[in-house]
């Protein structure tokens, strides 16, 4: 408590005793205190270097919202991963693609993915299917993959490796035309992969909402301009914030790629979190322009994208 107090954090809505219990039972110091980066500090006077209008209750609230956000995002990313895998396998079948050839060429080009398959053989739930379609020597080296069809690669690969296979096949089969489609744009999908990994590893996503150096893919920036009421300058500034850029990209790809049945349920959850739960204790953030402007920007994108959901 002394460390937070020395930095200007108050305990008006949650007492110090309650805060101590919170750290013992619900969360640790680092994962709670990290959100202080979203608050301004005094730059002069006796309180120089101390936070302005930062109560412990605000840190707790952001922590709770971040947790709920991560849970939802993991499911949305899984929906996108599923949709991409279905679309690629369907493409193979509809066009009678000899997928054995593409699997062989892919693994010859991406050596590290062969090593990942070896690791999955030893640790994952895919070991039976891996043993059926791949051959290993006595040292557990992958030596033959000629009997592996495309659908098996789609099934066993982790999301990041799958994206490499996905874009390899798209490039080989269709050329670069697909790059104009946001749901098949490599930069956009890798932003989603990064967000998925961060949520899956339980990282604090809302740790810092200040503008930084992230550069949005052109297709993302153009789509946001089409859907948002904000000026281009504001959009460009907000999209330099990594958590905002990744989430906005997720929203745009999700809308375009995921089936209507799945989308209807998930967007209902999304709106419940952003348009209701996040507003529940909004009064404690009314003096924080960074948090308010970030929320309103995201709210605008959600409403502009899912008007009919």
Regions found by a protein language model. Give the residues of each.
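Extended intrinsically disordered or low-complexity regions, especially N/C-terminal cytosolic tails and loops
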Residues: 1-194, 206-309
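Acidic/aromatic/glycine-rich contiguous surface patches that form carbohydrate-binding/processing clefts
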Residues: 202
